[in-house]
Amino acid sequence: GDDSSHWNFDPVGGDNKSTVDDFGFVDALLDNLSSNYQINRDRVYAAGFSNGAAFAFGLACYQSENIAAIVSVSGSMSPTQQEGCNPQHPTPVMSIHGTQDSYFLYQGGYYLSMDAVTNYWTSYNQTQTTQPTETVSYDGLIIEKFSHTQGNNSSKVDHYKINGGYHIWFDIDFNGQSTEDLIWDFVSGFDKNGAL
């Protein structure tokens, strides 16, 4: 196994770095939290960076009964995730990705390209419209926002293409909103039944 910190983004036995059942861990964690605290199980979200982003996609694919919406920062889906993905409800997805990412290549490689990821989720969610691209310049980067809306249960798929961006958690300002503001504004508009 791999002793480095990581999330296994496929079910046990899949394309993982170790045999740890991270999906079982999340399931047990949510059960524990809901037993001990007043949490709304319909409004659980997953956001991650890099391998954590791939795990967020895994949660949407394999454990969607626990997840209302996900966000990927500098991550992608594996081919095994694409093949085995079986969400139980329309799943809003937001991704932020740099075109110069040397680990999860924007144009794809072993992991899916950002176009392939976006196409997978727009097809699954059956989004009907693509909003005009918004373009913002920030700190020498050109940021393009692609928004696919009016999916089943009012789901949507938003993608922020960071032209020239590397494999990092982006500290951006997009029309006055930080990365974290964008993420919260996106996910908090949904529960497992759709738009709020």
Q: Where do the language-model regions lie?
A:
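Sec-exported extracytoplasmic/periplasmic mature domains
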Residues: 31-38, 60-68, 122-126, 188-192
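C-terminal catalytic histidine-bearing segment of alpha/beta-hydrolase fold enzymes
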Residues: 93-96, 111, 122-196
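A structural motif
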Residues: 86-102
